[in-house]
A protein has these predicted regions:
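N-terminal beta-strand motif that seeds the catalytic metal site of vicinal oxygen chelate
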Residues: 7-45, 50, 101-104, 149
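Phosphate-end processing signature that detects enzymes handling 5′-triphosphorylated RNA
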Residues: 1, 87-91
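Short consensus segments that form the blades of beta-propeller domains
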Residues: 24, 94-95
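Vicinal oxygen chelate
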Residues: 1-26, 36-55, 59, 69-79, 84-85, 115-150, ...
Length: 150
């Protein structure tokens, strides 16, 4: 790719290095969103008409009381989530503001370290179905859940 932007100045290089060394900067990679929907099958069917195919079959996540199915949209995954049962974070999001984003998903290099770091900052970890992910209730701060995956 050809860039028309001039090379970074010495000051810009130093500024970037300083900011990257900050303890709150992390190497998380944004990989997708969880979307609260009224019907996983209808949402997946609609996206299929747009040319986006499911990356998995619908499944039930008993720890978060929801049905989910992922769709690859370019480099991101849209995971459609439908509440199942009464105590569902997804259902809470639907009741509060209707269909839309309720979960931000990031890939991390060391799940145990990042989980410990977030818990040390006071974030509440909520149940997840496997050892490859950790969910945090950040609704008070950002009106979404935060999910880290290994």
């Amino acid at each position: 790719m050809i860039s028309l932007r001039p090379p970074a100045t010495e000051w810009e290089v130093a500024w970037k290095a300083n900011n990257e060394a900050h303890p709150l900067v992390n190497d998380w990679r944004f990989i997708g969103v969880g979307l609260a929907v009224n019907s996983v099958s209808e949402a997946a069917s609609y996206y299929a008409t747009l040319g986006f195919e499911p990356i998995d079959e619908p499944s039930i996540d008993t720890s978060l009381s929801m049905q989910r199915q992922g769709i690859q949209v370019g480099p991101l995954v849209f995971e459609f989530c439908q509440p199942v049962g009464k105590n569902s974070y997804c259902g809470d999001a639907l009741n509060r503001r209707g269909e839309g984003v309720f979960d931000l998903v990031f890939q991390v290099k060391n799940l145990a370290d990042e989980t410990a770091r977030l818990e040390s900052h006071g974030l509440k970890k909520i149940a997840c179905t496997d050892e490859q992910s950790a969910c945090f209730d950040t609704r008070a701060e950002g009106n979404t859940l935060l999910r880290l995956v290994a």
